[in-house]
Amino acid sequence: MTNYIFVTGGVVSSLGKGIAAASLAAILEARGLNVTMLKLDPYINVDPGTMSPIQHGEVFVTDDGAETDLDLGHYERFIRTRMTKRNNFTTGRVYEEVIKRERRGDYLGATIQVIPHITNEIKRRIIAGAEGVDVAIVEIGGTVGDIESQPFLEAIRQLGTEVGRDHAMYMHLTLVPYIAVSGEVKTKPTQHSVKELRSIGIQPDILVCRSENALPSNERSKIALFTNVADKAVISLKDANSIYKIPAALKAQGMDELVVQRFGLECPEADLTEWEQVLYAESNPVGEVTIGMVGKYVELPDAYKSVNEALKHAGLKNRLTVNIRYVDSQDIESKGEQILHGLDAILVPGGFGERGIEGKIAAAKYAREQKVPYLGICLGMQVAIIEFARNVAGMESANSSEFDPQTPYPVVGLITEWLDADGSTAQRSEASDLGGTMRLGSQLCHLIPGSKVHDLYGSAEIYERHRHRYEVNNNLRDKLEASGLKVTGLSTDKRLVEVIELGDHPWFVAGQFHPEFNSTPRDGHPLFEGFVKAAGEYYKNNN
């Protein structure tokens, strides 16, 4: 039977529930347990696919094509279980399903209510997502007290009762602020947060207290007394300069043992050797590089969370500290390419819309002409192709039909049909809805032997995740290749261009897919490793 750990948050948002939950999952996995994680988001959007990255951060894409919360990226970076569509759902998704069933007549004329119909659907989805594992860690988005979270909290209260105390635990994460003027930590916000949680019938079994510094034992005992939580179950989680230190910090306080004892699980001690190796590499770099991230959502780094992490992972593999300099592509348009001076490499990540596009094209041009290592991801590949078409292939005014429908050279256009990795044919048009209609999920890519990417991956066939509507226009592909563009990766049916390279450049690679979603701190990713290595070589040669 699956054991459940329900994770809630209190006092303020953005405390790191996802990191704390994923760190606990990493320890349990290191004890040989089969672990999965779920994220329940209270917002009414069906999924985050059409939400602004400035408001919500990155959209993380799973192998099976789900557009999900960025916390699922944390989950995959901390544990080896692959997330799927079942691991993330929203209020909007729940209501959509319940209303669909009501219209179909499944409820036999009943009056549809939050309790029991909405809460039952939430429970059904939790159970389905947790099927077949030893432990399922279920994170509830938002904070206790939010009106949007109430159906989810009621659902996990009911589910905890139904599976029984031996198979359910509640973990609550709160803030314990430090008041510098008085030199004291304040436990009252945590006490009130737990009081709020208990008022709806949930008694936390573990309290994780976020604070600037480690909590003194007397303060932990005080919190335990007023929240009815055992002393040993009040966990102090101080600020850390690396999220990959959190598993060891939680293990040192015996959090995993609390879980194992509660569920009566027999398993060996956690072996955190892999995480120790990650921390050693992070703490002992032999050099550093500065990589320019050219985008239009740079005011919120979480909009590029997986790319940021993938660069750090590649730095670990190369024993280099990767400093990321965020460059607003609109600043390149207004101030010129001098903004890019001093960079050891340039990365243009995915994105949508016309704003700032000419700045990204200028960044690709600068990288090509100055022989600066370049990695283009999704839109980053498309702007590289537009730049090459305009300035090398003689196609003046070349563009994507997304940005200029009247361009005489639409080198990038809407994909109207493609073959998915499972062999099914997908079709789209300009009239298709924005949400959930892109080429999504893991797709097979054929790499050309002898190419840089083939050498990096060490394989002729790879699987990478996609999230896009536009692709290279095959009608103009021959002209691009005749001018020196190398197409080194093709789709399942070998019709869509997936990877390009420049043969006369030390390191210029761009892919239509999102390799960042497959990068982890323990394993890295070959494309990012090669990119950061090239940045290190560029630094050596120019300093």
UniProtKB/Swiss-Prot annotation:
- The positions flagged as active site in the entry are 378 (nucleophile), 514, 516
Q: Single Gene Ontology BP term?
A: pyrimidine nucleobase biosynthetic process
Per UniProt, residues of the Glutamine amidotransferase type-1 domain are 290-541
**Is ATP-binding among this UniProt entry's keywords?**
yes
Q: Which residues bind CTP?
A: 13, 146-148, 186-191, 222
Arranged from A to Z, the UniProt key words for this protein are: ATP-binding, Glutamine amidotransferase, Ligase, Magnesium, Metal-binding, Nucleotide-binding, Pyrimidine biosynthesis
* Catalytic activity entry: UTP + L-glutamine + ATP + H2O = CTP + L-glutamate + ADP + phosphate + 2 H(+); L-glutamine + H2O = L-glutamate + NH4(+); UTP + NH4(+) + ATP = CTP + ADP + phosphate + 2 H(+)
**Positions of L-glutamine binding:** 351, 379-382, 402, 469
> Does the keyword ATP-binding belong to this entry?
yes
Under the heading SUPFAM superfamilies, the entry gives: Class I glutamine amidotransferase-like (SSF52317), P-loop containing nucleoside triphosphate hydrolases (SSF52540)
Stored PANTHER family:
CTP SYNTHASE, CTP SYNTHASE-RELATED
What exactly does this protein do? Catalyzes the ATP-dependent amination of UTP to CTP with either L-glutamine or ammonia as the source of nitrogen. Regulates intracellular CTP levels through interactions with the four ribonucleotide triphosphates.
Q: What else is known?
A: CTPSs have evolved a hybrid strategy for distinguishing between UTP and CTP. The overlapping regions of the product feedback inhibitory and substrate sites recognize a common feature in both compounds, the triphosphate moiety. To differentiate isosteric substrate and product pyrimidine rings, an additional pocket far from the expected kinase/ligase catalytic site, specifically recognizes the cytosine and ribose portions of the product inhibitor.
What is the recorded name of this protein?
Answer: CTP synthase
Protein species of origin: Pseudoalteromonas atlantica (strain T6c / ATCC BAA-1087)
Which lineage?
Answer: Bacteria, Pseudomonadati, Pseudomonadota, Gammaproteobacteria, Alteromonadales
